[in-house]
C-alpha cells in the first residue's frame, strides 16, 4: 500500500509554508544561512524534532521557523525547499498558505512578492508540481493587519490571477474572535477570492455556528463539528480538510482511531486528507494516506477516490482540475493493467 500511495499523484489542500519544512530541509536552510557548525541552530533543530501533545507548544515551534525565514534569502529558499519536499512526495498540486509578515528586512507586500517569485522559480526546477498561494490571516494578530493582508491579496491576485486563489483564516484558535474578521473575509469573497477557514479546531460551538452561517469554500480541521454541522457542510458540498497526525500530535484528538475522519466518511460528507504542517508534525501526504488506510481500512480505490475528491475541491481552474484528474486516472489505469 505504501508504494502505491507514494506513486499516487496526490493533491494537498491544507499546507502552511512555515510548517512544511522537513528536518532535512530545515538543515539545508540552516546550513545556507548559518553554515554547518552553528551550535545554536543544531540545538534548535533537536528541539524542533521533539514533540508534546499540546497545541500551544506546536505554535511555539513556528517561532523557530519564522526566525529562519526572517530574511529575504531565508524566506525565498524556505519556499523553494517546501515545494521540493512536496514534489519528492509525488504531490502534483499544493495550495500553500502563509501569513505575510513584516520586519526590518521586508514589508508584508515584500513578503508575498518573495514567496511568489520563489514559487515561480521552483516551477522551473519542479515542473511536475503546481503550486498556488493562499495568503493567511492570523486571528491572533490585530484586525488592521488582516485588512492589509486582504488588500495585498486582492491586489496581487490581479497581477497573478492563476497563483493567488484565496484567503486562509488560521492561527491559534484560542485567540481572537471570528466576528472581528468576518467583514474582512466578506470583502475578500466579494473580490472573488475563495475562503479556507480553520473551523472547529477546538471546542467552540457558538463560533462554529457563526462560521457556518457566514459560509466558506472549505473547512479546515473540523475536529469538533457535530453531526448536524457535518450535515450542513455536506448539503453545501463544502469539503472538510482532515489532518490526522496534526490533530493527534497537537492534542485535539486523543488517538488516530478516534479521529473525526471516520464520522465524516460515515456521513459521506466531502473530505480531503491533508498534512497541515508536514515538517512540524514529521509527516508527508503519503504517510497521511497510509495512516488513514491502516486506521480505517481504506482500499486503493478509496484512496484514489479521496484524491479525486481533493481535485474537485481544489481552487484550481476547471482545466487544471481536468488535467489533475487525468493524471490520477492514468495512474489507476496502469495499476489495473
UniProtKB/Swiss-Prot annotation:
Gene3D superfamilies: Metal-dependent hydrolases (3.20.20.140). GO terms for molecular function: adenosine deaminase activity; metal ion binding; N6-methyl-AMP deaminase activity. It catalyses: N(6)-methyl-AMP + H2O + H(+) = IMP + methylamine. Transmembrane segments: none annotated. Binds 1 zinc ion per subunit. The record marks 221 as: Important for catalytic activity. This is Adenosine deaminase-like protein. The gene is Ada.
Amino acid at each position: 500500500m505504501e508504494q502505491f500511495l507514494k506513486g499516487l499523484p496526490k493533491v494537498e489542500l491544507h499546507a502552511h509554508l512555515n510548517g512544511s519544512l522537513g528536518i532535512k530541509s530545515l538543515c539545508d536552510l540552516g546550513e545556507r544561512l548559518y553554515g554547518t557548525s552553528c551550535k545554536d541552530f543544531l540545538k534548535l533543530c533537536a528541539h524542533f524534532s521533539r514533540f508534546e501533545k499540546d497545541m500551544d507548544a506546536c505554535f511555539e515551534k513556528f517561532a523557530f521557523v519564522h526566525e529562519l525565514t526572517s530574511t529575504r534569502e531565508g524566506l525565498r529558499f524556505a519556499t523553494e525547499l517546501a515545494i521540493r519536499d512536496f514534489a519528492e512526495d509525488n504531490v502534483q498540486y499544493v495550495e500553500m498558505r502563509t501569513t505575510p509578515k513584516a520586519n526590518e528586512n521586508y514589508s508584508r507586500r515584500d513578503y508575498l512578492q518573495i514567496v511568489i517569485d520563489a514559487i515561480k522559480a521552483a516551477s522551473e526546477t519542479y515542473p511536475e508540481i503546481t503550486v498556488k498561494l493562499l495568503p493567511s490571516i492570523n486571528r491572533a494578530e490585530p484586525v488592521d493587519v488582516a485588512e492589509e493582508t486582504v488588500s495585498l491579496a486582492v491586489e496581487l491576485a490581479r497581477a497573478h490571477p492563476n497563483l493567488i486563489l484565496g484567503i486562509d483564516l488560521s492561527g491559534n484558535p484560542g485567540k481572537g474572535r471570528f466576528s472581528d474578521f468576518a467583514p474582512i473575509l466578506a470583502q475578500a469573497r466579494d473580490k472573488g477570492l475563495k475562503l479556507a477557514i480553520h473551523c472547529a479546531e477546538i471546542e467552540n460551538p457558538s463560533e462554529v455556528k457563526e462560521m457556518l452561517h457566514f459560509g466558506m469554500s472549505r473547512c479546515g480541521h473540523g475536529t469538533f463539528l457535530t453531526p448536524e454541522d457535518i450535515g450542513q457542510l455536506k448539503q453545501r458540498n463544502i469539503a472538510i480538510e482532515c489532518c490526522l497526525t496534526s490533530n493527534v500530535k497537537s492534542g485535539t484528538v486523543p488517538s488516530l482511531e478516534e479521529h473525526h475522519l471516520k464520522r465524516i466518511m460515515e456521513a459521506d460528507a466531502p473530505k480531503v486528507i491533508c498534512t497541515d504542517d508536514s515538517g512540524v508534525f514529521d509527516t508527508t501526504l503519503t504517510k497521511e494516506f497510509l495512516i488513514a488506510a491502516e486506521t480505517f481500512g481504506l482500499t486503493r480505490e478509496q484512496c484514489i477516490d479521496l484524491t479525486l475528491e481533493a481535485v474537485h475541491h481544489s481552487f484550481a481552474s476547471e482545466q487544471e482540475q481536468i488535467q489533475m484528474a487525468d493524471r490520477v486516472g492514468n495512474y489507476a489505469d496502469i495499476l489495473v493493467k
